[in-house]
């Protein structure tokens, strides 16, 4: 009986610890730690014939909110063409933001990226060229930077 109790305890303690760590990670992932920056970067996501997917629209809405709070004077939208070569994720983002009141001159489009890694590299080059030192990156919990 003692042995069963020890085995149960040996399994329960790590499980409780793991659940606690997972809860803390989940809690921290919802905290918005944005500080005033030179630019807001919106990572691309799917677009459907010129319309942002729900994921992209959520990112754009958050970028718009940050912009209206004056967290940065510029927004950089990223992402190239997917299945439809007429539209790019970055271009769709620009259109969405201008329709929602962001002046076109405040938006920079990186429309070549076919991956997050490519877009981040391209944005780094844009920021260096424009002497932008800091950025707020808008993404969702499932994207990895």
Question: Model-derived features: where do they sit?
Answer:
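N-terminal type II signal-anchor transmembrane helix
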Residues: 1-32
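A structural signal for short, hydrophobic/glycine-enriched beta-strand patches
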Residues: 21-145
